Curated annotation (Swiss-Prot):
Glycosylated. Heterotrimer: Snake venom phospholipase A2 (PLA2) heterotrimer that acts as a potent presynaptic neurotoxin by blocking synaptic transmission and synaptic vesicle recycling. Enzymatic activity is essential for the neurotoxic effects. May act by binding in a calcium-dependent fashion to neurotonal pentraxin-1 (NPTX1) and neurotonal pentraxin-2 (NPTX2), but not to neuronal pentraxin receptor (NPTXR). Also binds to taipoxin-associated calcium binding protein 49 (RCN2), a protein localized in the lumen of endoplasmic reticulum. One of its GO terms (cellular component) is extracellular region. Heterotrimer of alpha, beta, and gamma chains; non-covalently linked. This is Acidic phospholipase A2 homolog cannitoxin gamma chain. Expressed by the venom gland. It comes from Oxyuranus scutellatus canni. Keywords: Disulfide bond, Glycoprotein, Secreted. Belongs to the phospholipase A2 family. Group I subfamily. D49 sub-subfamily. It is found in: Secreted.
């Protein structure tokens, strides 16, 4: 399993997950 973004921090990942549940188009815009 290769990681596309090794610099992906858990904070960003957690933020993306939380922004994926609600209509977080602005969140995914980063």
């Amino acid at each position: 399993s290769e990681i596309p973004q090794p610099s992906l921090d858990f904070e960003q990942f957690s933020n993306m997950i939380q922004c994926t549940i609600p209509p977080g188009e602005e969140c995914l815009a980063y």
